[in-house]
Regions:
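Cys-nucleophile CN-hydrolase/nitrilase-fold catalytic domain and related Cys-dependent amidase chemistry
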Residues: 17, 25-106, 112, 183-201
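A conserved C-terminal secondary-structure "cap"
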Residues: 252-273
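Residue-level structural signal for beta-strand termini and adjacent loop
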Residues: 54, 60, 114-115, 156-157, ...
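Extreme N-terminal starter segment of soluble prokaryotic enzymes
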Residues: 1-7
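Active-site catalytic loop in hydrolytic enzyme cores
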Residues: 91-171, 184-188, 193, 259-263
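CN hydrolase (nitrilase-like) catalytic-core segments centered on the catalytic cysteine
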Residues: 63-83, 150, 156-245
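Short beta-strand scaffold segments in enzyme catalytic cores
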Residues: 84-86, 99-102, 142-144, 225-227, ...
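Short polar catalytic/cofactor-binding loops
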Residues: 10-15
């Protein structure tokens, strides 16, 4: 299988959709200039609102979202595969979907994925999140054929549910994408170890573009976009600033890792009495 170059675009998005689109497009171009064939942006690419209600007010139905034509156009112009980590897509009067879009080099939407696991937590820092108040969770996992490998899609909080990734791996995925907006608190504690664990458990590459730094709405996200090898090695990492990081992805390394430690073959259903 052919080696390809993947990029994570790290953003510090605000509640200004058009400003965020421009910032994302600039970094997608930078990623392509670094040789990327596949570029991924983070969760909430075009909208980091102060709360779910504000995000709902600023969201669009898919057919009206100004980001999609812009991202489809740049994918075609640069001849890249582009994963738009997620957009807030209005699906009813009071709900959005947290939806990823995979766009092919002809500017066509190749796949969609709605984040399954919603972030409803109370953190020791006092931060409180109730994503389910304004977001409808998805119920379908997605695996897509790229020219180089099968890609398994996920978003942010999905990372804490290892069975999703095992199911994606069993469906043939050897590369996982995890576009995220981890909080500074949870990111510092868990980001690196969770991404490395998902890679090691499944012998898969993990491509995890992140939101990073202090946002205009007061929220602080962790940044540190990562690309992790199937052996759990960090092969590219961002800081907390907007940036693009790249790494070469050799799908043969996934097969080698799975041959060394064949846990996918050894995985068994267990009956608990």
């Amino acid at each position: 299988m052919t080696v390809f170059r993947a990029a994570c675009v790290q953003l510090r998005s605000s509640d200004d959709v058009h400003e965020n689109i421009r910032a994302a497009l600039d970094l997608v171009r930078l990623a392509r200039s670094l040789g990327a064939d596949f570029v991924a942006t983070p969760e909430n690419t075009t909208l980091m609102a102060p709360d779910g209600g504000a995000k709902l007010e600023r969201s669009f139905e898919e057919k009206d979202d100004p980001a999609l034509p812009a991202f489809c156009s740049i994918a075609e112009e640069l001849r890249i595969w582009l994963l738009v980590g997620s957009l807030a897509i209005k699906v009813s009067a009071d709900k959005t979907a947290n939806r990823s879009f995979l766009i092919d080099p002809k500017g066509r939407i190749s796949a969609r994925y709605d984040k399954i696991h919603l972030f409803d937590v109370d953190l020791p820092s006092g931060e409180r999140y109730r994503e389910s108040n304004t977001v409808v969770g998805g119920d379908v996992a997605t695996v897509v054929d790229l020219p180089w490998a099968k890609l398994g899609l996920s978003v942010c909080y999905d990372l804490r549910f290892p069975q999703l990734y095992r199911d994606l791996a069993k469906a043939g995925a050897s590369v996982f994408t995890v576009p995220s907006a981890f909080t500074e608190t949870t990111g510092r504690a868990h980001w690196h170890v969770l991404l490395r664990a998902r890679a090691i458990e499944n012998g898969a590459f993990v491509i995890a573009p992140a939101q990073g730094g202090p946002h205009k709405n007061g929220r602080r996200t962790y940044g540190h976009s990562l690309i992790v090898s199937p052996w759990g090695e960090i092969i590219a990492e961002g800081s907390t600033e907007p940036c693009a990081i790249v790494a070469d992805i050799d799908p043969n390394l996934s097969a080698e890792a799975r041959a060394r430690v064949p846990s996918l073959q050894h995985d068994r259903a267990i009956l608990i009495r």
